[in-house]
């Protein structure tokens, strides 16, 4: 048990370290609140359950890299259990009690602590070896990917600090248990610590007590020393990852974008040119990022050698935010545009908007949406976009399709006796054909085959015919939200007039938009 002086010292250290961390967290969440939109906190019970379930099961992590993910799972369980262990050690330090006692419950408590300590230590050693000795390619970025000036050395330094913190914290506590076991001549509930305790069999009672006392301070002292650094470290994902799942928007589909209110006369910025223009949930993403690069593994642009890395985008924003979050929280503007530090102009237009990065992220980050918002700024505010898109935008605006083709949208149906909504009211399905199936010869085969299936099945259907226009999804993904807004408004008017019972589509762009 601690002396009165040690108890007072501990309280002072706790107050100091929590005070320092409080200022950082206040700046962090103040910077996040500078973003556009809001964090989503509706249906709290469901959101809390989702956050806890994802954190404890690690199901989103286990979707890729199964071996590494299982090791990470043990570390997570160890971290969660160590909240209980540290609470117990704190109580034992301040009061002359044995946490959970010496009975069966206390035995199970110590057994789980013993097993999880070993698994955690082994897991952290594995990850340190993987990063610093094996230098796993999955944890690196290609040289052509733009990185924040502080990112490349910062990632390695931060990983080392976090790894050593866990080793010292868990290792000190584990050694402390071995000294205590040697002091009381064994504990069958702690087999691993018991093996280490044999090394101390020749030490005196006083020496064992001293080392047990020192390791108590070392184990809990490392936490106190780490807490002020915690908000700046990658370890912050332990808090921000579950909170990200807790506060992220509920999307009806993987790539569903937030609409822009063009009727709001007070709005001066469309899209994201600077950090504070991003959605609040996407600023949250930067702090939740684990820097595992799983999104990079599945990014088709990165795999084919482009400058785009979804992981680098989040990492770059994270390092910039760490430097400017105090000013952002105070109401200042961020000093640099996103294209100066977060992502290159080439990388912005390399994204295919496939959503693979969103689907794979263990903590629910959405780097694809950051890119979509940057594109909105480039198109709507700066009129900067690849020349190839000019023709597509013009085609969607004037011809109702991205290829500027003036062909009939019913040419594909020649000889099939396909009814339009102007021909009949007796139909149960409106087949939305889409631009490709209407105008592109290979895709027309899909439309014809589907119609033949519907006719053979006796399904009553109709198409819009010449009234059908592109849904504008390609314009939206390319950042031209206003063109999409105009096209969507026209399509909504048409659909409200027709009022179809059900809609059938074969185009994924049409599906997402409708």
Model-derived regions: residue spans:
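Iron-sulfur-cluster electron-transfer modules
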Residues: 2-133, 277-286, 312-314, 321-514
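Alpha-helical membrane-embedded segments
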Residues: 13-21, 120-124, 167-168, 210-246
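Juxtamembrane/interface segments at transmembrane-helix termini
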Residues: 21-40, 91-95, 126-141, 175-189, ...
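Juxtamembrane inter-helical linkers in multi-pass membrane proteins
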Residues: 32-55, 135-154, 188-200, 239-268, ...
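Hydrophobic alpha-helical membrane-insertion segments
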Residues: 73-84, 160-184
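Membrane-interfacial helical/loop segments at transmembrane boundaries in membrane proteins
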Residues: 91-108, 141-150, 178-211
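A conserved hydrophobic secondary-structure block that centers on an alpha-helix together
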Residues: 115-118, 123-167, 171
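Ferredoxin-type iron-sulfur electron-transfer modules and their immediate structural context
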Residues: 213, 227-351, 399
